[in-house]
Amino acid sequence: MKKIEAIIKPFKLDEVRSPSGVGLQGITVTEAKGFGRQKGHTELYRGAEYVVDFLPKVKVEVVLADENAEAVIEAIRKAAQTGRIGDGKIFVSNVEEVIRIRTGETGIDAI
């Protein structure tokens, strides 16, 4: 099993959460703030300058079977891409075990 974590721009969430042709069982979405190469930026508010160090992002997490990982990664990449700095990152890691709390199911059946 794989866990895919994608850090994306918030306005891309609707496109990422329902990629066409990929049967996702479910996702977890978390609001986040951060910066990468683009760093922050300066904003002017009521005549005063403010440095915005952390930019709003959304973290999307999906756990799925190994054989579905590449298709989901590509679907997320295509949906989240704007071609501009700050599009985000996708992290892929192995998941050793999944347990559904309600039923006690384990492994791929628990997803």
UniProtKB/Swiss-Prot annotation:
SUPFAM superfamilies with a match to the protein in the record: GlnB-like (SSF54913)
Keyword Transcription: yes
Keyword tags: Nitrogen fixation, Nucleotide-binding, Phosphoprotein, Transcription, Transcription regulation
One GO term of the biological process aspect: regulation of nitrogen utilization
Segments crossing the lipid bilayer: none
Modified residue annotations for O-UMP-tyrosine: 50
Cellular compartments per GO CC: cytosol
Ribonucleoprotein listed as a keyword: no
Molecular function terms, GO-annotated: ATP binding; enzyme regulator activity
Function: In nitrogen-limiting conditions, when the ratio of Gln to 2-ketoglutarate decreases, P-II is uridylylated to P-II-UMP. P-II-UMP allows the deadenylation of glutamine synthetase (GS), thus activating the enzyme. Conversely, in nitrogen excess P-II is deuridylated and promotes the adenylation of GS. P-II indirectly controls the transcription of the GS gene (glnA). P-II prevents NR-II-catalyzed conversion of NR-I to NR-I-phosphate, the transcriptional activator of glnA. When P-II is uridylylated to P-II-UMP, these events are reversed.
Subunit structure: Homotrimer.
UniProt record similarity statement: Belongs to the P(II) protein family.
Protein name: Nitrogen regulatory protein P-II
Organism: Rhizobium leguminosarum bv. viciae
Lineage of the organism: Bacteria, Pseudomonadati, Pseudomonadota, Alphaproteobacteria, Hyphomicrobiales
